[in-house]
């Protein structure tokens, strides 16, 4: 199995292809990407027969920006007979996966696939039973075994394969299903909530998103991101010349500072979180974020970088490299992750966590 399917946001196939070609090449896993505009997925075809499995095992999924999900697959199954679609699929998977832990029958996230998605949900139940009988799936769901993927690109036409549960997205189609809170000031609140799900392990939420923490929201108006921090019982400095939602001010947890987010300097020394969703050139935002991290003004940050019309992967890579270089120059160890989230549009969301300072005299951040 030498092909890897990567699901992405429709319209960003070229960026997804450029990224996987670059990062696979860095690991000497060579191949080429098949791209169809607005398809919502990319296929990276490796030159060596076993390199698909090697790629999804060795390249950390968390290092990918534009992929929502990935899995290795074999040849395309076409013209599945309507009276028995199950037998050919089981045949393709036998000998490839043994005792898989979960089945996901998926499609790309496009308008054209919505009808197909209804079929996938109905088809999952009988297919799961058949795969269990054949030994492809274990008799119970377990996160410790590979995930079996059946990916329909058209009626009667699918790829079959698998991903490793330790190196994939835990979400169906790579999309967390979040509900918009009725009392939130704007839909942008879902970006930050999704970022928490993607970047912070669930078992670390109580420690890293704790009650009573201090946080700063730069460019906060009307308060979509502040809302997420308030919901987790943090104290928030919301920085923006524009007004904040009164419902947030009424909580007593928000201090509204009518200032430019680029000029604001914190006076507290115990700020755990800084978040930022400002419409500005990505290089300018990256420079501001680096300044906050280098100066130790916050421990963790989540921010958005708005994307240009062209060379989006190159632009994001350049900005992330700049932040990394600034941290390295000042002896600061940090984890950097970036992802184009489901709720993002022409942007990517970045998470940086200071871990410790390698320079004497700096406070350990762990």
UniProtKB/Swiss-Prot annotation:
Major location (coarse): cytoplasm
Binding site for S-adenosyl-L-methionine: 188, 221-224, 240, 260, 277
Active site location: 306
Catalytic activity: cytidine(2498) in 23S rRNA + S-adenosyl-L-methionine = 2'-O-methylcytidine(2498) in 23S rRNA + S-adenosyl-L-homocysteine + H(+)
Enzyme Commission number(s): 2.1.1.186
Keywords: Cytoplasm, Methyltransferase, rRNA processing, S-adenosyl-L-methionine, Transferase
A Pfam entry, by short name: RlmM_FDX
This protein's record includes keyword Metal-binding: no
One Gene Ontology molecular-function label: S-adenosylmethionine-dependent methyltransferase activity
Top EC class for this record: transferase
Compartments reported by the entry: Cytoplasm
Signal peptide, first to last residue: none
Annotated transmembrane regions: none
Biological processes annotated in GO: methylation; rRNA processing
InterPro entries the UniProt entry points to: RlmM_FDX (IPR040739), RlmM_THUMP-like (IPR048646), RNA_MeTrfase_FtsJ_dom (IPR002877), rRNA_MeTrfase_M (IPR011224), SAM-dependent_MTases_sf (IPR029063)
Cellular component terms per the entry's GO annotation: cytoplasm
Methyltransferase listed as a keyword: yes
Subunit details: Monomer.
Record family assignment: Belongs to the class I-like SAM-binding methyltransferase superfamily. RNA methyltransferase RlmE family. RlmM subfamily.
Functional note: Catalyzes the 2'-O-methylation at nucleotide C2498 in 23S rRNA.
PANTHER family registered for this protein in UniProt: RIBOSOMAL RNA LARGE SUBUNIT METHYLTRANSFERASE M, RIBOSOMAL RNA METHYLTRANSFERASE FTSJ DOMAIN-CONTAINING PROTEIN
Protein name, UniProt field: Ribosomal RNA large subunit methyltransferase M
Organism: Escherichia coli O127:H6 (strain E2348/69 / EPEC)
